[in-house]
């Protein structure tokens, strides 16, 4: 068989019978395998040497020819060719079937492919193939119809009636005849006409039939090939039979399955020769069909064939499928030689690029290299002698080993390898003992600790592999996290504590207040023990003295020369910032030097500090008792309100939980305050938490404050908190309550790891072929980015979103008019600073989402590679990096956050509105009424405010340099004050002169208000920072009367829509609307005037508590009913990992909201079939219908004006609706924001572009809406680029192009719909993918990584790109000297 190495594509097709025969070296006629006496293969059996080749090298079966010189000769006695025994892995045989048999892949898998072609249901097809029913093939001139099914009796009757004038048959023969008679072209045009007739109502079956027919036409496959006359037999070495110790044989299951087929086939052949009765033959044919089905796919049958130990036999399909299948077990993941594993221990003496390898292990790993050197040095002359020297471990061997490992990198890997930093290269250093030594600073990238973790070592063998390890994988070249560009090599724990101790300041210690003329004098004083590290001193730097501490001088002096003096207490955050800054300014070489110095110093001073903890370090605040008593008083008041019936049970519960949350928070603040003051800040517990070395505020709270609220198994919070802390000790009940949380924590962690791993696998699968392939795709589209704000606070600055991208537009300075950023220019840190100083906070940048590269993405749209802060290089596998960046932090996400009235996780919910900054109220939106001198919002409202960033009294100003409403930037002159000094602006904003004040104000911002908010200010008011401007009820949403009149109940019927419950605790009667839905009843409260005319109407959602009686007088602003927030608790809101899963899989949320399809005016209609019809009337007067389940809480009222995409009722947003209503760009923004929100809440930073890469892959396909003159089928889903290509061709030929709409596909589905069938088959549903690919004659262009790994090519990224494969080195012919 010839070696095929260099091919570019792979095609899969259905094999025709002739092709199967051409592969074969002979027919297998007997089911025998090996002769039990001679242990040689039986002739014509499943292991026959004549067919499959000899079992002994260069020897025929009978032994007449023995030697390589007879190569290729066929023995005249035994007919066996003299060859190498390896041909038994390649040579195939065949079985000539006595009756045609259908292939299980094409008839059994849903949808049945044969069934679709012939338009027969799967069950009918089954009954034909299994000889239960006849099918009419040619009706002739009878009343029968073609393809009509007949049972035995009907067939006999028809035979008697019509004789031979019609033909009907059963079994695979019948199906084969029908398939041979199919005219695909005629069928195709007939179906296309049917689709046009049906138009929008096209059923999926028509679409599927058309797709299959088109696939057969294009691929050149013939439909009748799905029925087999001849069966291939795979080479015997692939289904081996081996002798075990006891003389028994172990055989592959396939041999048993083949034997069943051969036995039944031979029996059928004999029966046919004997002209046996039809019923017996039919039964044998059915059994043959059944045995071939088992051979191809045993697991898919209802009755599985079982082997000796009652275990299902593994068929051909099973060998491909699943984790243990050929794809995932042997092709995508292989075992490696030259590797070892051992426990890791810390190696504080190592340099960053080194690791310690046990001498014994190194000797074994580098054995071939050592042997070579031994032979070269003429210490020995053959390999055998060299091996024995190595076993004796003589001195020369160790010397040679030392030389061999110098500059020969090894790869260290820790499982699980969640991102690319899970494998890094180091230079090995020989160490004693049996443990691998690891540098402490790379632990974070590996997520390793030294509590028994193990790591694997791999040796790169070839010079090319070694060069790649040095250049790309060395730990010193992997300092940054590819997910976000932040340093990933940074100190933690001991090192941080040591440096924090070194750089802290302490009062009243030796040498305080002394002055030193230079750093050396300080070091001298320390060495002479006349100066304490934490003493505050003054040191001359340049011309002036700076206030610092001795420890900071020690730290700064140790750093590499270029780095400026670091004068602050170093916590972990400060150290990371320092590393980041040094990297940006001085580059990686200085950082590497600095990191080793930091490690050294940290360990040394942690040892010097020698911190210990005692019980007396845990200080419980004395005020604890006061706080707890205060909380108990508040709870008594809440209980009292509840007893009186003022609040509902749910509100009481929410309020109690809120009180305890607040109390816990106050107590924690007090406790931290006391700890901070204790021993001048040198309380060890406080130091550990404050430095970020170990422990958190939350953990200290449990030690010295109170443990706080616990959750039940159901996720509800138990309203009785654990008031004790660990120092005081828990009571029995408190201990019992806490056990549940502890157990849940452990169970969750186990589940979470598997889930996060599966998420990563799906992400890698969808993005694995996204590689940077070209420099510039030339797009003119981009996306808008701006700083992400929550009210006033900036959650993510513009810098995080834009740095490293390319601008799509030219940006000029609003003041000078000079160009700051040009089109297609990289946005660097400096450019961002420039933009910030001139007040530009919105940009349009190039993004992977808008990239138009046909395959993968282009350099300009991707921007910067975060692993080295340089523009991304062509060939970078950005899809895999994106998948790893999203999947790796998955284990840190919570499994599910229980949402309980907004507390437990989020602390307490406030009931007041107060803003941090002073502001001016610019305007109000939303329906509100005047009540008691304030404004009451009866529906949701919006405050429009402008923040006051800077203010100065006009009285202090001599001359103004600016005018009202003028824009100012940093450094601009504002005024000259009374003393003649010019004052410059240090802010960006707009000038506002009001109430004798000069102010700089921000752009207008919106703050949303809840229903029932009472506002105490008016438009135009200036409000000081921190003033309470409004109040609301955080635990209930009221329905408020907007007019004065009399209450009238409509459809509120006791026992039907209204439920009266007597509260057993309080004895009060609570009236609640039921959440049952009635066809015609629509419970609402009307307000009527004196004449009995309805002037207002309020729809009551399910679970609303009535606050009024029928016929009662009501005033503006009175509460009619309220909805308790507690009802949200039951609709458990998914957070964390499950939420990310739902978003990537584009699942439709359970509690769906309805979005307005257009902008317009809301009009309420009646309830039909349990759903309320709401029309939105657009500007042209067209009504757009929206159906909302009755009982849902509506967010709009009759007559409201809504915008397209506004939510009409409570619930979660469906991403597919966003795409349909607001378009692709809005959908991308929505998904990006939602996914980032989950990660950001957990403190995980992932750059937008990684999520963008995945979203781009989810939106690769479009759905055909109108076919035009193209070959597409209505409703078909096709690749965007294929769609544009075909349209381009049709337009060039003067035809009408097709029209398509964008669609969103979840990641699992998108991975299966990928162009490469190898990649899709190795992901999931292997057999289904291969079935469809073979019908379509799919060609795999081997563009992605996975396909190439499977077939054993270099992956087409980085150095393996085709770009570099054809590089040849030519000798320069200029030989003149």
UniProtKB/Swiss-Prot annotation:
<keyword id="KW-0460">Magnesium</keyword>
<dbReference type="Pfam" id="PF04997">
    <property type="entry name" value="RNA_pol_Rpb1_1"/>
</dbReference>
<dbReference type="InterPro" id="IPR000722">
    <property type="entry name" value="RNA_pol_asu"/>
</dbReference>
<keyword id="KW-0862">Zinc</keyword>
<feature type="binding site">
    <location>
        <position position="62"/>
    </location>
    <ligand>
        <name>Zn(2+) 1</name>
    </ligand>
</feature>
<feature type="binding site">
    <location>
        <position position="858"/>
    </location>
    <ligand>
        <name>Zn(2+) 2</name>
    </ligand>
</feature>
<keyword id="KW-0808">Transferase</keyword>
<dbReference type="InterPro" id="IPR042102">
    <property type="entry name" value="RNA_pol_Rpb1_3_sf"/>
</dbReference>
<dbReference type="InterPro" id="IPR012754">
    <property type="entry name" value="DNA-dir_RpoC_beta_prime_bact"/>
</dbReference>
<feature type="binding site">
    <location>
        <position position="449"/>
    </location>
    <ligand>
        <name>Mg(2+)</name>
    </ligand>
</feature>
<keyword id="KW-0479">Metal-binding</keyword>
<dbReference type="GO" id="GO:0008270">
    <property type="term" value="F:zinc ion binding"/>
</dbReference>
<dbReference type="GO" id="GO:0000428">
    <property type="term" value="C:DNA-directed RNA polymerase complex"/>
</dbReference>
<dbReference type="GO" id="GO:0006351">
    <property type="term" value="P:DNA-templated transcription"/>
</dbReference>
<feature type="binding site">
    <location>
        <position position="78"/>
    </location>
    <ligand>
        <name>Zn(2+) 1</name>
    </ligand>
</feature>
<feature type="binding site">
    <location>
        <position position="451"/>
    </location>
    <ligand>
        <name>Mg(2+)</name>
    </ligand>
</feature>
<dbReference type="InterPro" id="IPR045867">
    <property type="entry name" value="DNA-dir_RpoC_beta_prime"/>
</dbReference>
<dbReference type="Pfam" id="PF00623">
    <property type="entry name" value="RNA_pol_Rpb1_2"/>
</dbReference>
<comment type="subunit">
    <text>The RNAP catalytic core consists of 2 alpha, 1 beta, 1 beta' and 1 omega subunit. When a sigma factor is associated with the core the holoenzyme is formed, which can initiate transcription.</text>
</comment>
<dbReference type="InterPro" id="IPR006592">
    <property type="entry name" value="RNA_pol_N"/>
</dbReference>
<dbReference type="GO" id="GO:0003677">
    <property type="term" value="F:DNA binding"/>
</dbReference>
<dbReference type="GO" id="GO:0000287">
    <property type="term" value="F:magnesium ion binding"/>
</dbReference>
<feature type="binding site">
    <location>
        <position position="60"/>
    </location>
    <ligand>
        <name>Zn(2+) 1</name>
    </ligand>
</feature>
<dbReference type="InterPro" id="IPR007080">
    <property type="entry name" value="RNA_pol_Rpb1_1"/>
</dbReference>
<dbReference type="InterPro" id="IPR044893">
    <property type="entry name" value="RNA_pol_Rpb1_clamp_domain"/>
</dbReference>
<feature type="binding site">
    <location>
        <position position="861"/>
    </location>
    <ligand>
        <name>Zn(2+) 2</name>
    </ligand>
</feature>
<dbReference type="Pfam" id="PF04983">
    <property type="entry name" value="RNA_pol_Rpb1_3"/>
</dbReference>
<dbReference type="Pfam" id="PF05000">
    <property type="entry name" value="RNA_pol_Rpb1_4"/>
</dbReference>
<keyword id="KW-0240">DNA-directed RNA polymerase</keyword>
<comment type="similarity">
    <text>Belongs to the RNA polymerase beta' chain family.</text>
</comment>
<dbReference type="GO" id="GO:0003899">
    <property type="term" value="F:DNA-directed RNA polymerase activity"/>
</dbReference>
<feature type="binding site">
    <location>
        <position position="777"/>
    </location>
    <ligand>
        <name>Zn(2+) 2</name>
    </ligand>
</feature>
<dbReference type="Pfam" id="PF04998">
    <property type="entry name" value="RNA_pol_Rpb1_5"/>
</dbReference>
<dbReference type="InterPro" id="IPR007066">
    <property type="entry name" value="RNA_pol_Rpb1_3"/>
</dbReference>
<comment type="function">
    <text>DNA-dependent RNA polymerase catalyzes the transcription of DNA into RNA using the four ribonucleoside triphosphates as substrates.</text>
</comment>
<feature type="binding site">
    <location>
        <position position="453"/>
    </location>
    <ligand>
        <name>Mg(2+)</name>
    </ligand>
</feature>
<keyword id="KW-0804">Transcription</keyword>
<protein>
    <recommendedName>
        <fullName>DNA-directed RNA polymerase subunit beta'</fullName>
        <ecNumber>2.7.7.6</ecNumber>
    </recommendedName>
</protein>
<dbReference type="InterPro" id="IPR007081">
    <property type="entry name" value="RNA_pol_Rpb1_5"/>
</dbReference>
<feature type="binding site">
    <location>
        <position position="75"/>
    </location>
    <ligand>
        <name>Zn(2+) 1</name>
    </ligand>
</feature>
<dbReference type="InterPro" id="IPR038120">
    <property type="entry name" value="Rpb1_funnel_sf"/>
</dbReference>
<keyword id="KW-0548">Nucleotidyltransferase</keyword>
């Amino acid at each position: 068989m010839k070696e095929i190495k260099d091919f570019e594509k792979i095609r899969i097709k259905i094999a025709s019978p002739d092709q199967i025969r051409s592969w074969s070296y002979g027919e297998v006629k007997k089911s025998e395998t090996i002769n039990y006496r001679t242990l040689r293969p039986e002739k014509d059996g499943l292991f026959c040497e004549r067919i499959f080749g000899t079992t002994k090298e260069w020897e025929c079966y009978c032994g007449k020819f023995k030697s390589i010189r007879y190569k290729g000769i066929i023995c005249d006695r035994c007919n066996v060719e003299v060859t190498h025994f390896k041909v038994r892995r390649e040579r195939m045989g065949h079985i000539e079937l006595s009756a045609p048999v259908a292939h299980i892949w094409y008839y059994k898998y849903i949808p049945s492919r044969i069934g679709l072609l012939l338009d027969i249901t799967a069950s009918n097809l089954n009954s034909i193939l299994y000889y239960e029913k006849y099918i009419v093939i040619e009706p002739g001139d009878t009343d029968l119809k073609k393809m009509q099914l007949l049972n035995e009796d009907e067939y006999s009757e028809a035979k008697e009636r019509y004789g031979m004038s019609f033909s009907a048959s059963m079994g695979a023969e019948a199906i084969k005849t029908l398939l041979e008679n199919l005219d695909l072209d005629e069928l195709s045009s007939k179906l296309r006409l049917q689709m046009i007739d049906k138009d929008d109502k096209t059923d999926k079956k028509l679409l599927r039939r058309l797709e299959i027919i088109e696939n057969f036409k294009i691929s050149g496959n013939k439909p009748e090939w799905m029925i087999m006359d001849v069966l291939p037999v795979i080479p015997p070495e692939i289904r081996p039979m081996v002798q075990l110790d006891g003389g028994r044989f172990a055989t592959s299951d396939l041999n048993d399955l083949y034997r069943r087929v051969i036995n039944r086939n031979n029996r059928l052949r004999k029966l046919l020769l004997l002209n046996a009765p039809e019923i017996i033959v039919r039964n044998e044919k059915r059994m043959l069909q059944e045995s071939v089905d088992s051979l191809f796919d045993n697991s898919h049958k209802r009755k599985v064939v079982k082997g000796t130990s009652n275990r299902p036999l593994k068929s051909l399909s099973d060998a491909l499928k699943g984790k243990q299948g050929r794809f995932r077990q042997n092709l995508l993941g292989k075992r490696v030689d030259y590797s070892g594993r051992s426990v890791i221990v810390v190696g504080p003496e190592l340099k960053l690029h080194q690791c310690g390898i046990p001498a014994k292990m190194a000797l074994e790993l580098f054995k071939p290299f050592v042997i070579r050197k031994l032979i070269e040095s003429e210490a020995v002359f053959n390999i055998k002698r060299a091996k024995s020297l190595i076993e004796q471990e003589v001195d020369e061997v160790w010397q040679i080993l030392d030389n061999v490992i110098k500059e020969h990198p090894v790869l260290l890997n820790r499982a699980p390898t969640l991102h690319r930093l899970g494998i890094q290269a180091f230079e090995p250093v020989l160490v004693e003992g049996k443990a691998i030594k690891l540098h402490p600073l790379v632990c974070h990238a590996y997520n390793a600790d030294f509590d028994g973790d193990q790591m694997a070592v791999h040796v790169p063998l070839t010079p090319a592999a070694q060069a790649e390890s040095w250049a790309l994988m060395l730990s010193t070249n992997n300092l940054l996290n590819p997910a976000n560009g932040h340093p990933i090599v940074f100190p933690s724990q001991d090192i941080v504590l040591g440096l924090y101790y070194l750089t802290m300041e302490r009062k009243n210690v030796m040498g305080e207040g002394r002055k030193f003329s230079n750093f050396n004098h300080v070091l001298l004083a320390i060495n002479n023990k006349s100066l304490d590290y934490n003493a505050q001193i003054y040191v001359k730097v340049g011309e002036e003295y700076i206030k610092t501490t001795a420890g900071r001088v020690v730290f700064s002096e140790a750093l590499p020369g270029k780095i400026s003096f670091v004068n602050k207490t170093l916590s972990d955050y400060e150290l990371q910032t320092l590393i980041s800054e040094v990297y940006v300014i001085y580059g990686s070489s200085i950082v590497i030097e600095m990191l080793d110095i930091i490690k050294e110093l940290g360990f040394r001073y942690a040892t010097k500090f020698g911190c210990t903890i005692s019980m007396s370090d845990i200080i419980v605040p004395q005020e604890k008792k006061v706080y707890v008593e205060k909380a108990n008083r508040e709870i008594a008041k809440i209980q009292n309100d509840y007893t009186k019936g003022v609040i509902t049970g749910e509100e009481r519960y929410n309020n109690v939980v809120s009180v305890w949350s607040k109390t816990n928070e106050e107590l924690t603040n007090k406790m931290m305050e006391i700890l901070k003051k204790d021993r001048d800040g040198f309380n060890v517990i406080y130091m550990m938490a404050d430095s970020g070395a170990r422990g958190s505020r939350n953990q200290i709270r449990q030690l010295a404050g109170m443990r706080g609220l616990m959750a039940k198994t159901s996720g509800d919070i138990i309203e009785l908190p654990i008031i004790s802390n660990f120092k005081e000790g828990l009571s029995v009940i408190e201990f019992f309550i806490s056990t549940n949380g502890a157990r849940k924590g452990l169970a969750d962690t186990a589940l979470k790891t598997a889930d996060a791993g599966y998420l990563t696998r799906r992400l890698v699968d969808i993005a694995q072929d996204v590689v940077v392939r070209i420099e510039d795709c030339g797009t003119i589209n981009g996306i808008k980015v701006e700083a992400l704000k929550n009210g006033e606070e900036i959650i993510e600055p513009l810098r995080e979103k834009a740095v490293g991208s390319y601008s799509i537009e030219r940006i000029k300075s609003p003041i000078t008019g000079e160009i700051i950023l040009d089109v297609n220019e990289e946005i660097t840190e400096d450019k961002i600073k420039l933009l910030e100083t001139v007040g530009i906070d919105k940009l349009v940048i190039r993004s992977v989402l808008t990239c138009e590269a046909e395959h993968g993405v282009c350099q300009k749209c991707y921007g910067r590679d975060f692993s080295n802060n340089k523009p991304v290089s062509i060939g970078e596998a950005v899809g895999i990096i994106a998948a790893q960046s999203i999947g790796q932090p998955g284990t840190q996400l919570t499994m599910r956050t229980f949402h309980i009235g907004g507390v437990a996780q989020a602390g307490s919910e406030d009931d007041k509105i107060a803003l941090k900054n002073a502001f001016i109220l610019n305007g109000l939106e939303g329906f509100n009424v005047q009540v008691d001198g304030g404004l009451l919002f009866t529906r949701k409202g919006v405050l429009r405010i402008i923040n006051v960033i800077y203010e100065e009294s006009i009285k202090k100003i001599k001359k103004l340099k600016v005018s009202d409403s003028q824009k100012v930037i940093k450094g601009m002159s504002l005024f000259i004050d009374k003393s003649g000094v010019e004052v410059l602006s240090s802010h960006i904003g707009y000038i506002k002169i009001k109430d004798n004040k000069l102010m700089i104000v921000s752009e207008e911002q919106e703050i949303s208000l809840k229903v029932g908010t009472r506002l105490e200010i008016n438009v135009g008011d200036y409000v000081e920072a921190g003033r309470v401007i409004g109040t609301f009820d955080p635990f209930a949403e009221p329905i408020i009367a907007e007019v004065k009149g009399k209450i009238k109940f409509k459809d509120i019927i006791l026992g039907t829509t209204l439920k009266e419950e007597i509260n057993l605790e309080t004895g009060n009667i609570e009236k609640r609307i039921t959440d049952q839905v009635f066809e015609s009843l629509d419970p609402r409260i009307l307000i009527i005037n004196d004449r009995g005319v309805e002037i207002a109407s309020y729809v009551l959602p399910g679970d609303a508590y009535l606050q009024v009686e029928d016929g009662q007088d009501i005033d503006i602003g009175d509460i009619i009913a309220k909805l308790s927030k507690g009802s949200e608790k039951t609709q458990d809101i998914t957070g964390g990992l499950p939420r990310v899963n739902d978003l990537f899989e584009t699942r439709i949320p359970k509690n769906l909201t309805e979005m307005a399809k257009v902008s317009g005016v809301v009009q309420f209609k009646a309830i039909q079939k349990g759903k309320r019809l709401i029309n939105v009337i657009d500007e042209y007067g067209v009504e757009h219908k929206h159906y909302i389940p009755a009982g849902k809480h509506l967010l709009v009222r009759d007559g409201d004006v809504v915008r397209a995409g506004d939510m009409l009722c409570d619930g979660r947003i469906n991403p597919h609706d966003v795409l349909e209503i607001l378009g692709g760009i809005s959908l991308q923004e929505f998904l990006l924001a939602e996914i980032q929100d989950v990660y950001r809440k957990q403190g995980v930073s992932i750059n937008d572009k990684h999520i963008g890469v995945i979203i781009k892959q989810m939106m690769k396909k479009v759905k055909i809406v109108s076919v035009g003159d193209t070959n597409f089928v209505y409703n078909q889903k096709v690749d965007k680029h294929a769609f544009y290509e075909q349209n381009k061709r049709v337009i060039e030929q003067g035809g009408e192009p097709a029209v398509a709409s964008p669609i969103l596909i979840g990641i699992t589905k998108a991975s299966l719909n990928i162009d490469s069938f190898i990649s899709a088959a190795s992901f999931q549903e292997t057999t289904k993918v291969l079935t469809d690919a073979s019908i379509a004659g799919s060609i795999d262009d081997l563009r992605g990584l996975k396909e190439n790994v499977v077939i054993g090519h270099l992956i087409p990224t980085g150095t393996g790109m085709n770009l570099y494969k054809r590089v040849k080195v030519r000798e320069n012919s200029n030989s003149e000297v």
